Amino acid sequence: MAKKCDLCGKGVVVGMKLSHSHIRTKRTWEPNLQRVRALVDGKPRRIRVCTRCLRSGRVIRAV
């Protein structure tokens, strides 16, 4: 399962977690993805989109 938005392409970002004693360990930031039924080329399909695309109106929901 890809952790990537089907519309904007937003995906996982890798960085470092920094503890109080400045020990660095790798960690990931994952986008807030939701599975929604949306119209893609005029047909309803289940796609995985981030909440920013949902809120901005880039998704046409299928009823």
Swiss-Prot record:
Record-level GO cellular component terms: ribonucleoprotein complex; ribosome
Keyword annotations from UniProtKB, A to Z: Ribonucleoprotein, Ribosomal protein
Signal sequence, start to end: none
Short name of one Pfam family: Ribosomal_L28
Any one of the GO BP annotations: translation
InterPro entries the UniProt entry points to: Bacterial_rp_bL28, Ribosomal_bL28, Ribosomal_bL28/bL31-like_sf, Ribosomal_bL28_bact-type, Ribosomal_bL28_sf
GO molecular function terms attached to this record: structural constituent of ribosome
Keyword Ribosomal protein: yes
Record HAMAP family: Ribosomal_bL28
Family annotation (NCBIfam families): L28
Family assignment from sequence similarity: Belongs to the bacterial ribosomal protein bL28 family.
The protein, known as: Large ribosomal subunit protein bL28
The organism of origin for this protein: Desulforudis audaxviator (strain MP104C)
The gene coding this protein: rpmB
